[in-house]
Regions:
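Phosphate-binding glycine-rich loops and adjacent basic patches that engage nucleotide phosphates
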Residues: 17-18, 39, 58, 102
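Sec-dependent N-terminal signal peptides of Gram-positive bacterial secreted proteins and lipoproteins
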Residues: 1-19
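Generic secretory/membrane-interface signal
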Residues: 10-11, 27-29
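Glycine-rich active-site loops that engage anionic ligands at enzyme catalytic sites
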Residues: 58-59, 63-144
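N-terminal secretory signal peptides
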Residues: 29-72
């Protein structure tokens, strides 16, 4: 009987003991958003140190940037910070968010091939060109 009671007490202690698991990543619920002229776009970030640094920068507070047309394929402006570069030759597509020279943010609405770092991509570009319009534009990056 003592053995049975000892087993039951041990079992009760085991059941009530919290179970800790190692290496379980918390699901990221944060999404980067880009707001421009009344439109909000969700940005899917790349898996690189540049995108991680941008996320950290924007997490501190939302960032509003002035972007200007360049080459009839992108809007470009100063980030206000230098991010790590992971440059490679890539061909952009509409909605790509690109780091150029480590301190410039480029938002592509047409194709271009060059050496730069991809930061992310706008998930739904259906109204992107309409939102960007012609000339200079104010763009706000924030974490949801």
């Amino acid at each position: 009987m003592k053995k049975f009671v000892s087993v039951m007490v041990g079992l009760c202690l085991f059941i009530n003991k919290p179970i800790y698991r190692k290496n379980i990543k918390k699901k990221e619920s944060e999404a980067m958003l880009l707001e421009v002229n009344g439109y909000t776009f969700e940005v899917e970030l790349e898996n690189n140190t540049s995108a991680e640094a941008l996320k950290e920068y924007v997490s501190k507070e939302k960032r509003t940037l002035s972007l200007d047309d360049y080459g009839n394929f992108e809007k470009v402006g100063n980030l206000g910070i230098t991010l790590p570069r992971n440059d490679e030759t890539i061909t952009t597509k509409e909605g790509d968010l690109i780091l150029y020279l480590g301190n410039k943010l480029c938002l592509y609405y047409n194709q271009n091939t060059w050496d730069f770092t991809k930061l992310g991509h706008i998930k739904d570009t259906a109204h992107l060109k309409e939102a960007l319009g012609k000339g200079s534009v104010q763009v706000t990056l924030l974490m949801e």
